[in-house]
């Protein structure tokens, strides 16, 4: 993502999903922990959303803005990272990313979308670990 954007300095980055897995507020070994730390170290303006784990995550990273919805998280973002496969994320459409984000650039660590569908929908999409 840094190679694509050149810098994260003062760039809004959306993070969807903080929990280790859906249906829990458990953060143990959650990929979001290290990745958010790296984004902060590179100067990103990180905005996170998780329907259950946000409060626990905010205790660890009180400086991070926690959004109240997916739409608020994506609004004006230059890129989005998905770290938990919550059902409400799976239901998102390429149009939602295009409409809300400044740059519809998505890095999906859970492989919840079909890459071809996202690309046809106008989203620059990277499925990590597929």
Predicted regions and their residues:
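Structural/interface elements that position substrates and couple domains in central-metabolism enzymes
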Residues: 1-130
């Amino acid at each position: 993502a840094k190679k694509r954007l050149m810098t994260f300095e003062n760039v809004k980055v959306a993070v969807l999903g903080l929990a280790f897995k859906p249906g829990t507020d458990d953060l143990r070994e959650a990929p979001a922990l290290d990745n958010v730390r790296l984004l902060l170290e590179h100067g990103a303006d990180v905005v996170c959303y998780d329907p259950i784990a946000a409060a626990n995550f905010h205790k660890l990273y009180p400086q991070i803005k926690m959004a109240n919805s997916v739409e608020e998280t994506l609004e004006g973002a230059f890129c989005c990272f998905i770290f938990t496969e919550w059902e409400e994320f799976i239901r998102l459409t390429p149009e939602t990313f295009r409409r809300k984000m400044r740059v519809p650039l998505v890095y999906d660590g859970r492989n919840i979308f079909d890459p071809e569908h996202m690309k046809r929908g106008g989203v620059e999409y990277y499925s990590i670990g597929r």
